């Protein structure tokens, strides 16, 4: 685990089939630390999560529950996801304790609805620091650019494009993706470049 931004830490798990990293995040906050989309944690990372404490585990979408059950078990932190995605993850064996809704505040972030990949996908935006954390709304691949997942894995491609177009209107300098490489500068421009490729 390393500090990618002040107070935001990340660790990765490489996906051979995809050819890029899946990323988990730990965000320090005075009201309690947040763990976002926790990927498989090596022993030292799991020990650190336990030592530093996690107040809440928040999940961006139904496919990013990942190792939330393990982190919940070890830290005692409740797991939250949007209710539209909750039934699917419960069927997969995930334990969900709370709901996330667009407009809600979670630590330093505003919860932003980005449906399309799944009906309940959310992102986390910190306007003060111009940071956006996403799950599957966009991926950081190829490195330095942003792209969408293949349409066959999207519930509603047109709705996702509309969601991403709305993200491009936010004030964003840094984008931290659940999948792929982070964009640490000019992320708003990378989002707008992606939106410019969408069909009219």
Regions found by a protein language model. Name each.
Residues 1-25:
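Short, compositionally biased "basic patch" segments
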């Amino acid at each position: 685990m390393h500090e990618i931004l002040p107070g935001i830490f990340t660790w990765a798990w490489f996906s051979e089939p995809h050819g890029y990293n899946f990323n988990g995040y730990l965000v320090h906050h005075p009201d309690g630390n947040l763990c976002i989309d926790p990927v498989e944690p090596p022993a030292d990372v799991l020990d650190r999560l336990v030592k530093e404490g996690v107040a809440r585990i928040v999940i961006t979408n139904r496919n990013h529950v990942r190792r939330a059950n393990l982190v919940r078990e070890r830290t005692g932190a409740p797991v939250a996801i949007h209710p539209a995605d909750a039934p699917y993850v419960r069927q997969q064996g995930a334990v969900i304790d709370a709901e996330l809704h667009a407009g809600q505040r979670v630590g330093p972030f505003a919860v932003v609805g980005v449906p399309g990949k799944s009906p309940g996908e959310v992102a986390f935006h910190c306007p003060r620091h111009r940071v956006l954390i996403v799950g599957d709304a966009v991926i950081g691949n190829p490195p330095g650019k942003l792209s969408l997942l293949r349409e066959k894995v999207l519930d509603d491609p047109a709705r996702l494009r509309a969601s991403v177009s709305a993200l491009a209107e936010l004030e964003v300098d840094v984008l931290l993706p659940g999948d792929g490489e982070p964009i640490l500068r000019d992320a708003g421009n990378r989002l707008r470049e992606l939106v410019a490729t969408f069909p009219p």
